[in-house]
Amino acid sequence: MKTYINPNAEQWNELAERKTVATADLNETVKAVFNDIQKNGSKAVKKYTSYFDGVSIENFAVKSSEIENAVAQISSDLKNAIQVAADNISKFHNSQKEIPTKIETTSGVFCWRESRAIDTIGIYIPGGTAPLFSTVLMLAIPAKLAGCKNIILCSPPDKNGNINPAILYAAQLTGVTQMYKVGGIQAIAALTFGTDEIPKVSKIF
């Protein structure tokens, strides 16, 4: 990391610049990955995980032993902090639940509004240098309260092929039903089309 102290005014524009990505090139890459995964399933997902993340994954599904190991690595302080956050998020979203109200518009005719949960959803949790386990809480908790039966989590693996322990801890705490070690474009494509290892979902958050 470079540090600049009191840079000259002539440098301001250069220092404020951000790298840009050619949208057309990015779109073509995404289309190619999606088409490949739609056609070749998990084989293609493994190929792109190796290419983009630099790690070879044999089985994407997180095992129960991996979750147990992750839980053991989390400090009591962090567990308590996650629990407090989970309780607060639950309290907030519980207050948003609808109270069904039936209206008799004419004699014998009742009308009401009803919300129904999506059966199977996917949640994508960024990993890398700043694993956002808070995103697990903010996505999985309202999904669970809404009544989603299947909550599928995807998060990129590290160089050792593991998901960050805090993400796994938050996932098991909030009732995520399945967890997969896959990230990036390939994770979104896998959730979109489904593969022999990763289920297709109805909506991705």
Question: Model-predicted segments: where are they?
Answer:
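Conserved small-residue-rich beta-alpha loop and adjacent elements
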Residues: 103-169
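Conserved NAD(P)+-binding/catalytic subdomain of aldehyde/semialdehyde dehydrogenases
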Residues: 175-205
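Active-site-proximal helix-loop elements at catalytic-domain edges
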Residues: 1-13, 165-179
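N-terminal Rossmann-like NAD(P)+-binding subdomain of aldehyde/semialdehyde dehydrogenases
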Residues: 1-119
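Short alpha-helical
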Residues: 43, 131, 186
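Short coil/turn connectors at secondary-structure junctions
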Residues: 98-100, 116-120, 146-151, 174-177, ...
